[in-house]
Amino acid sequence: LQAGFTDFHYLRPIWAKTTQKDALLGIGMTGIGSGEILKYDLEIAAYMAKQVNQLITEKTGINEAARITCVKPSGTTSLVLGTASGIHAWHNDYYLRTMRFNKNEDIAVYLMKNHPELCEDDVLRPTDTVCVRIPVKAPEGSILRTETAIDTLERVKHFSTNWIKSGHINGDNTHNVSATISIDANRKYYDRHDSTSLINEFLEGPMNEWEVVGQWMWENRESYNGLSVLPYWGGTYQQAPFEDITEEEYNKRIVTLKELDLTNVTEQDDTVDFGQVAACAGGACEIQF
């Protein structure tokens, strides 16, 4: 059904023809950092996705998808489902997830009134913005952000090879595993085993993670389409999106969270602040319907 939605009022007609021809799908996975999916055969999963696509396209009369499988960032989806985001690891065993709301939003009004213990004034915009801090516990045995960059890259390679490419039918480029690689410049690799056999045998002494990742990316350039690479930062700042906490702090905070009843939140008026939406800066959206 998704591939059949090709009537784009805001794009040139050529794009409708392109989307009808390729009928692309984006069947993604998220929560991979919990480790459960790693037990299963991704090639079989991709095969089943192709079979279902073939069955449905025969019934709907559209083209079969040129590319079916992907791994998206899944930031919002992971919050709704309570999972790790896309291919990425969990932040830690226990942490706070901080969300920001305009104080005039109905959900913010409800939380500030009924659950003030979850709310803090934003230190940068205390007059109009509230931070809501939610305690999170990663499932037992989950992959955590403390893993090495090579561990993350090898997981990207595994999904790219067995899930993405297995779901590719035609086209010059495959879909991608969306991933941000955090590199710790203080982490050293001392032997070939440490860096999954990537250290040049002619180099002497340890390599830092930037060097090892650069070498991995070159030698495995067929295993990804694009990657974001950022320095790992183990510090914190006030009201960061993710902040480590202890198990004791988690247990203290989760009691309040269990008492939430969001069915009491009703939106009477449109309180969207278009000034905080990039595409609608200045109060006028770029895309008009």
Predicted segments with their positions:
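Nucleotide/phosphate-binding sheet-loop regions of phosphoryl- and nucleotidyl-transfer enzymes
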Residues: 25-30
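Short acidic, low-complexity intrinsically disordered linear motifs used
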Residues: 272-289
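Internal maturation/activation junctions in enzymes
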Residues: 6-14, 31-73
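Exposed boundary/loop context
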Residues: 19, 54, 68, 275-276
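Catalytic alpha/beta core of large soluble enzyme barrels
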Residues: 1-11, 19-22, 73, 82-271, ...
